[in-house]
Amino acid sequence: MANQKTYTYPIFTVRWLAIHALAVPTVFFLGSITAMQFIER
């Protein structure tokens, strides 16, 4: 529970993969919706 940049546990990698696995499709989904809105108008 210390504020040190330790790479002993792979939690950082799993957390990074989880964040990107959720963020990338979300950004793509929002971008496609925005494109549909601009194309429709």
Curated annotation (Swiss-Prot):
Name the domain of life.
Answer: Eukaryota
Q: Give the transmembrane ranges.
A: 16-32
Q: Where is this gene product found?
A: Plastid, Chloroplast thylakoid membrane
InterPro entries per UniProt = PSII_cyt_b559_bsu, PSII_cyt_b559_CS, PSII_cyt_b559_N
Keyword check for Transferase, yes or no: no
PROSITE patterns in the record, alphabetically? CYTOCHROME_B559 (PS00537)
Topologically, how does it sit relative to the membrane? Single-pass membrane protein
Q: Which residues bind heme?
A: H20
What's a Pfam family in this record? Cytochrom_B559
Q: Which terms does the UniProt entry file under GO BP?
A: photosynthetic electron transport chain
Q: What Gene Ontology terms describe what this protein does at the molecular function level? A: electron transfer activity; heme binding; iron ion binding
Q: How is the cofactor bound?
A: With its partner (PsbE) binds heme. PSII binds additional chlorophylls, carotenoids and specific lipids.
Q: How does it assemble?
A: Heterodimer of an alpha subunit and a beta subunit. PSII is composed of 1 copy each of membrane proteins PsbA, PsbB, PsbC, PsbD, PsbE, PsbF, PsbH, PsbI, PsbJ, PsbK, PsbL, PsbM, PsbT, PsbX, PsbY, PsbZ, Psb30/Ycf12, at least 3 peripheral proteins of the oxygen-evolving complex and a large number of cofactors. It forms dimeric complexes.
Q: Which NCBIfam families match?
A: cyt_b559_beta
Outline what the protein does: This b-type cytochrome is tightly associated with the reaction center of photosystem II (PSII). PSII is a light-driven water:plastoquinone oxidoreductase that uses light energy to abstract electrons from H(2)O, generating O(2) and a proton gradient subsequently used for ATP formation. It consists of a core antenna complex that captures photons, and an electron transfer chain that converts photonic excitation into a charge separation.
**Descriptive protein name:** Cytochrome b559 subunit beta
Organism listed in the record: Oltmannsiellopsis viridis (Marine flagellate)
Q: What is the lineage of its organism?
A: Eukaryota, Viridiplantae, Chlorophyta, Ulvophyceae, Oltmannsiellopsidales
